[in-house]
Amino acid sequence: NTASVAQLMVSLVLAMAGKLISSSIVLALLPLFCGILLAPSCEAATVDTTSATLLQVKSGFTDPNGVLSGWSPEADVCSWHGVTCLTGEGIVTGLNLSGYGLSGTISPAIAGLVSVESIDLSSNSLTGAIPPELGTMKSLKTLLLHSNLLTGAIPPELGGLKNLKLLRIGNNPLRGEIPPELGDCSELETIGMAYCQLIGAIPHQIGNLKQLQQLALDNNTLTGGLPEQLAGCANLRVLSVADNKLDGVIPSSIGGLSSLQSLNLANNQFSGVIPPEIGNLSGLTYLNLLGNRLTGGIPEELNRLSQLQVVDLSKNNLSGEISAISASQLKNLKYLVLSENLLEGTIPEGLCNGDGNGNGNSSLENLFLAGNDLGGSIDALLSCTSLKSIDVSNNSLTGEIPPAIDRLPGLVNLALHNNSFAGVLPPQIGNLSNLEVLSLYHNGLTGGIPPEIGRLQRLKLLFLYENEMTGAIPDEMTNCSSLEEVDFFGNHFHGPIPASIGNLKNLAVLQLRQNDLTGPIPASLGECRSLQALALADNRLSGELPESFGRLAELSVVTLYNNSLEGALPESMFELKNLTVINFSHNRFTGAVVPLLGSSSLTVLALTNNSFSGVIPAAVARSTGMVRLQLAGNRLAGAIPAELGDLTELKILDLSNNNFSGDIPPELSNCSRLTHLNLDGNSLTGAVPPWLGGLRSLGELDLSSNALTGGIPVELGGCSGLLKLSLSGNRLSGSIPPEIGKLTSLNVLNLQKNGFTGVIPPELRRCNKLYELRLSENSLEGPIPAELGQLPELQVILDLSRNKLSGEIPASLGDLVKLERLNLSSNQLHGQIPPSLLQLTSLHLLNLSDNLLSGGIPGALSAFPAASFAGNGELCGAPLPSCGAPRRLPGAEVSAIVAAIAVVSAAVCVALLYIMLRMWSNWRAVASVSSSDGEETASSVAAAHGKWCAGDGKYWKVGSVSVASSAAEEKYSSASSETTSVLHGKPAEAAGGGAGAVKPASKC
């Protein structure tokens, strides 16, 4: 081989040297021999080294697609996939493995490829750091590592790549700051570091890069301002730093970037005005400043940028009028986006019409002015004849939609919603044959939908909701065969849904809620096979659901509530496997709910107030993502299925007002996200489950009107977020646990109509957000806790009636200044009515009747009717007899006295007759006895008669109300025999009514 030959030649030369020439001459010639003889060997060594380096780089990669399987020492390295060599010389100059699905890391050994000028490892899944060793590759001109999963910081060693022209390392989760050393890469033309996680400021050393043409730093977390030194990048064509946290003002020096074609500063925190120097960027075609905090007006200097095609200044705080910018001067402008600023005034006539003669001479295709405070009409837009998209929504525009709207024949999108347009939808709208989106919602449009709308064969979205439109939905609308979404919510459309609705084969959303539509749901609706959302609620639709409903295989949301639909559900609905939301509440549906349970993806099933019967099928639990299950007000019966415990995402469970029986299933304890549990109005038995206390998200618990027994479990105190607790109308007993006081968020506590005993726990004072407290019709005893006066939000009612409460009314109740109704009737309260109750200025219903109260009624409380105080024998003062007046005897006492008078009178007559017959025979003795009896009796009768007369007179003159005693007795008797609490209102006179008017008693 070559090495052996070389060795032989050297030996031969040395042998000859001993005989012919001196050794010094031989040694001097030896390198020349080596260079000649060993050249092939040196080249082979270089190739071998490059091959070994590449194989070492390969070892760091994972190659699932086997792209690098051909890399082997036996093959020529220049034939390896992705390797580029200098033609004819075998020197590796490029490595391109972009998009090969590689993972793994970049080996530092890659720096051994000293002759490589281009490395492209982009669009793979490489991880790890960028090797700092890359900075030693002096020949490198192109480094593309973008779109990988590289992490760590950008190595500052890259600043040593003096020949580097193209650096793209974006779309990696790189962290840290941009190394200022990159400013030493004097040949750099492109820097791409977008979509990383870089922080810190843009280094001012970037301004040293005189050859830089593109700088892309979008979507990082860079801070600080734009460095003034960027003005040194005289060749910069693209500057994009969008979606960072850059702030400060836009430097006026940016106007010195004379080569700039694209400027994107969007979604930062720049403030101040738009520098007029931007008008010096004569080559600018793209200007995007959206999403900053810019103020001031739109500089007129922008009109000098004749090459501009896109201007987006939206989502700032720009003010003034838009007349500063003229599409007629910016003849290449296609996009003008000024949405969501503070612009005012009107749409200028000269926007697209420079000569003012109504002849448009601009190229403007897309105009977005939404979310400002523009007024006036949109007539000026009619000269922008190139327009394809108009969005002037969310302004204060007025007037009518101009009939000449068809002067914009290329219009594709027309968005006029959220303004104050009036008048009718002009029939000329049907001439816009390219129209795809018509959004007119939330205006004041009247009249009907013109039949000409049926010409819009390309129309996809038709939004007319929240207007005042009337008339029938025209059949011609169903000729718009491209329609995908129709929303007429909140108008006054009447008549039937068009029978030809099935022509809309592409319809995905049909929203007709809150109109006056009548008649049945058309059977042809089943032909709308693309329908995903159907909302027909709040109309006057009637009839049964058509069997064709079962063909709507894509249907996900269907709301039919508040109509007059009836009958059993079609069995075909069981085939609707994509249903997620069903709301059929407030109709007249009957039969079983099984047809609605074909889908296992239900999140809402609301069937409240219908006439569904049977049991809840266990199949309902297949929809494990169910959030709301509302079956209240039906005729469902049987036990609550234990399978409901599988609905672990459930937040609302309302089974109230049905015929369910049995215990509350313990499996419901698995529904840990429940916020509302309503089981009231059934026939449930057993105890209130202690596990309810584990439902930490519970906000409403209503188990009222059942047949539950036992006590209130102390565990309920664990429901710290509970807002409403209602256990009324059961057979519960025992004491009210003090743990109820832990429910500090409670607004409503209703425990009435049970058999609770013991005292009212003073711990209730901790429920300081209570605005309704009902404990009536129990057997509670002891005093009313003064602590109840510490419930400052109590407003709707405090009802403690029909218990066995004793003691005095605590003065602290006067602190309940928001209270509107107070019922303490039918207890054993004694003492005086505390004057502090006069502080209850919001009180309009009061019932203190049937207690043992005494003393005078405090001043302003006299405005309440006498029934509010009845049954308290020692109370006096208006509206009762005044204090100190003779007491009016009850009817029983009057009857007894009358009977006594009659008996005594008869006895006197008999005695007198007896005396006369005796002819004075025993006069002295009889006279003595008769005289004493007679005087006593006569004086008693006279006293009784005077007392009743005086009492009657004073009683019926109290106030200005005169009520017969029998009526009064009947009223009180009625009040005391009622089975529900009765509160008595103030007379109308106190509220401004006529004298003597009395409000009827009200039930709570």
Locations of regions flagged by a protein language model:
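Plant-biased, solvent-exposed loop and capping regions
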Residues: 1-1004
